[in-house]
């Protein structure tokens, strides 16, 4: 296993930019000040054949992007450079990212820009609701950047989006993918307990050993507690959690992570391959084989999760409606040549 980070000072580079309100810092400027420094990637690992996405309709992708720009909205699909964007947009689905496009955290696996965010857009809840209605969505996913600058972490803004969206699209199910509300858990959970989504999702991202390197400013147990406490308050609402593999974790650590999530009453799980957004982000430690993802799904079913999706291209909101309704995880797209080489052609 290779090290994804270093604890000594790297070769000298230009001094990183300082955060200016409303300006996004990306790449080196974003990660330069995290505790464990990233070694810029010189040569990325070659992607295996199973890192593939389905071809999509350019016209539908363009239509959704046009609608989003008209309403001045962001999607995590675009801001985090999700590889599934063409497929999801062509399917008429998108994960809306509220509270702006500037995050107050500096996670080195994420492509969302860091900095000092602007004030909340008071029209964003209405614009989000109008877009959900205009696209005719039956299932919508709402996520956000971290907003450590807000007294409630942005929980009330989630509530306003929920209320506006349900007023215009009462039959649309809404999943929220929330930040950890660090230092604001009680007030955030009070608000989201009273005005609840259909699915409460929070990503734990990685195993506890890797938190200092990959989730600076976050706490593993805090994320577990957020999920457990919400389920205790609203046992009628499905809880969900996602994490990545390929950052340097071991298979045994993943099984322990799944045990922890089950012990904290999480209902649904997503597990996906980490893909490096740029040379200045954390490098890929390894590409996890589809057979290993299958072992995680088998284990998750064995210990009693309602549904677990694990695969190279799985993300927390990947076909979220299908997972909610209990469908099985789609198989990864692979070439016949690769399957034949593994003796699996026709299986």
From Swiss-Prot:
Disulfide bonds: none annotated. Residues 89-306 form the Radical SAM core domain. HAMAP family: Lipoyl_synth. CDD domains: Radical_SAM. Pathway: Protein modification; protein lipoylation via endogenous pathway; protein N(6)-(lipoyl)lysine from octanoyl-[acyl-carrier-protein]: step 2/2. Pfam families: LIAS_N, Radical_SAM. Its cofactor is [4Fe-4S] cluster. [4Fe-4S] cluster 1 binds at residues 77, 82, 88, 317. It is found in: Cytoplasm. Its EC number is 2.8.1.8. It comes from Psychrobacter cryohalolentis (strain ATCC BAA-1226 / DSM 17306 / VKM B-2378 / K5). It catalyses: [[Fe-S] cluster scaffold protein carrying a second [4Fe-4S](2+) cluster] + N(6)-octanoyl-L-lysyl-[protein] + 2 oxidized [2Fe-2S]-[ferredoxin] + 2 S-adenosyl-L-methionine + 4 H(+) = [[Fe-S] cluster scaffold protein] + N(6)-[(R)-dihydrolipoyl]-L-lysyl-[protein] + 4 Fe(3+) + 2 hydrogen sulfide + 2 5'-deoxyadenosine + 2 L-methionine + 2 reduced [2Fe-2S]-[ferredoxin]. [4Fe-4S] cluster 2 binds at residues 103, 107, 110. This is Lipoyl synthase.
């Amino acid at each position: 296993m290779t090290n994804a980070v270093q604890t000594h000072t790297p070769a000298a580079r230009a001094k990183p930019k300082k955060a200016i309100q409303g300006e996004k810092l990306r790449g080196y400027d974003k990660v330069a000040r995290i505790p464990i420094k990233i070694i810029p990637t010189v040569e990325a690992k070659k992607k295996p054949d199973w890192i593939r996405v389905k071809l999509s309709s350019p016209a539908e992708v363009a239509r959704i992007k046009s609608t989003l720009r008209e309403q001045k909205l962001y999607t995590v699909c675009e801001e985090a450079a999700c590889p599934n964007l063409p497929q999801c947009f062509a399917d008429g689905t998108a994960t809306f990212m509220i509270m702006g496009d500037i995050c107050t955290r500096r996670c080195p696996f994420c492509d969302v820009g860091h900095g000092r965010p602007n004030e909340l857009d008071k029209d964003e809840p209405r614009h989000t609701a109008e877009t959900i209605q205009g696209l005719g969505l039956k299932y919508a996913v709402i996520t956000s950047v971290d907003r450590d600058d807000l007294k409630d972490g942005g929980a009330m803004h989630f509530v306003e989006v929920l209320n506006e969206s349900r007023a215009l699209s009462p039959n649309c199910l809404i999943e929220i993918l929330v930040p950890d509300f660090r230092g604001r858990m009680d007030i955030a959970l009070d608000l989201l307990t009273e005005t609840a989504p259909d699915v409460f999702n929070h990503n734990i991202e990685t195993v506890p050993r890797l938190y200092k390197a990959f989730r600076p400013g976050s706490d593993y147990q805090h994320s577990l507690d957020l999920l457990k406490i919400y389920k205790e308050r609203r046992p009628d609402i499905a809880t969900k959690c996602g994490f990545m593999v390929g950052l340097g974790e071991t298979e045994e650590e993943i099984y322990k992570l799944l045990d922890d999530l089950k012990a904290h009453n999480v209902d649904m799980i997503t597990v996906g391959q980490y893909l490096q957004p740029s040379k200045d982000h954390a490098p890929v430690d390894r590409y996890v084989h589809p057979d290993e993802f299958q072992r995680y799904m088998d284990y998750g079913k064995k210990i009693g999760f309602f549904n677990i999706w694990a695969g190279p291209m799985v993300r927390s909101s990947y076909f979220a409606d299908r997972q909610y309704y209990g469908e099985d995880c789609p198989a990864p797209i692979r070439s016949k040549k690769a399957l034949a080489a593994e003796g699996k052609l026709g299986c």
